[in-house]
Amino acid sequence: MLLLAGLLRRARPPRRPSVRRLSGLLDRYGFVPPASLTPHSASDDGGAKKRRPKKPPYRPPSSLDRGGRPAARSDLPFDFRFSYTESSPGDKPIGLREPKYSPFGPGRLDRPWTGLCAPAVDTTLRDAHADDPAPAAERELEEARRRERERVLGEPLTPAERAFLVSKCQKSRTKKQINLGRDGLTHNMLNDIHNHWKNDEAVRVKCLGVPTVDMQNVCHQLEDKTGGLIIHRHGGQLILYRGRHYNPKKRPVIPLMLWKPAEPVYPRLIKTTIEGLTVEETKEMRKKGLYVPVLTKLAKNGYYASLVPMVRDAFLTDELVRIDSKGLPKSDYRKIGVKLRDLVPCIIVSFDKEQIIVWRGKDYNGTIQDNTQKTSVSVLEEESAGAESENGDQEQASSDWASDECSQLSSSDEMPDDKSAISEADSD
């Protein structure tokens, strides 16, 4: 009992919560404490602390990011291709190597990419069974382009004007030129040509490699796709004139390709057996072709405009022709073989040991078949004919026309040689 009483005496009463006394100075001075000094209770926090918003991850600048801008629209009335000289709408592939990714970038062009080209007119409007599969809209675009080209070119150049432009574009006068290589006339080259035309009336184009086998096609595509006019040609060097009424501020919109699209899959060039021959005859011909005397040796990135006439002349005496292409890339001499097959024409026998072996065929009758001649007269011929009638000088007109001594393939174009006009201008 005594122990219990002692414990009760020692027990202290519970503490009362202390009452906070406010200072009387608050009533005297009317001081209001700022919010930062006011104590916050747990109930005022809302039960959770507000977190700072996270920064968005860093995104490097990219040309694919349009930033909400609409897709580019071009009024050019032809299908956009990677190369206009090394690809043809008539070549039908058997497959694609990759999905149909547009080389112009996602959302950058209002034309769909079919894997081969970006057509100017919807391909679903074509009627494959009609005499003219091109729709009416496409024919109207071609007619509008022809009229616009005639308007921009204006009146034909006089011999003195042409001689002045040609001399101005020579290597001794300027280093500006556009190099046309194994890929031919590419789509982005059109933009480069218009950039040169911004400051100069004419631009020099240097052609080397595979496209020079068919120089007539190169000249035709340059004039057709750019709207200019070739006023001079010497070998693989071309002078492309923009026209009298060309306005750089009204140049066409040419969207650039951001990468080279993959080549589609085409049928095999070399079949197991040649058409019209048996398996044994095909093997014997391929062995025999490797021992035929070499017609010529191709240099890398050379000028091959004389190759087609040489093969045609060789077929007058020999049925097999061998062309040495050692040192050339495999894709180059295979493309050359395809061009020979279409231009000579002939049959490809083999590409073994970097040799192009072609056969003239069973039904060869010795006549030269030129599939590259065009029925339409070039604008340059019309201009020269008009100048001849005005001047009345027959000798002057005949000297202005000169065929390329290195190639007869492009003789149908009859590009003028301005050496006589240049010499007359210098003598004056």
From Swiss-Prot:
Pfam families: CRS1_YhbY (PF01985). One of its GO terms (molecular function) is RNA binding. GO terms for cellular component: mitochondrion; ribonucleoprotein complex. Residues 155-253, 275-371 form the CRM domain. It is found in: Mitochondrion. GO terms for biological process: Group II intron splicing; mRNA processing. It comes from the Eukaryota. Residues 1-21 form a transit peptide. Disulfide bonds: none annotated. SUPFAM superfamilies: YhbY-like (SSF75471). Residues 394-413 have a biased composition (Polar residues). Residues 380-393 have a biased composition (Acidic residues). Transmembrane segments: none annotated. Keywords: Mitochondrion, mRNA processing, mRNA splicing, Repeat, Ribonucleoprotein, RNA-binding, Transit peptide. Residues 33-100, 129-152, 378-428 are annotated as: Disordered. Part of large ribonucleo-protein complexes that include group IIB introns. May be involved in the splicing of group IIB introns in mitochondria. PANTHER family: CRS2-ASSOCIATED FACTOR 1, CHLOROPLASTIC, CRS2-ASSOCIATED FACTOR 1, MITOCHONDRIAL. This is CRS2-associated factor 1, mitochondrial. The lineage of its organism: Eukaryota, Viridiplantae, Streptophyta, Embryophyta, Tracheophyta.
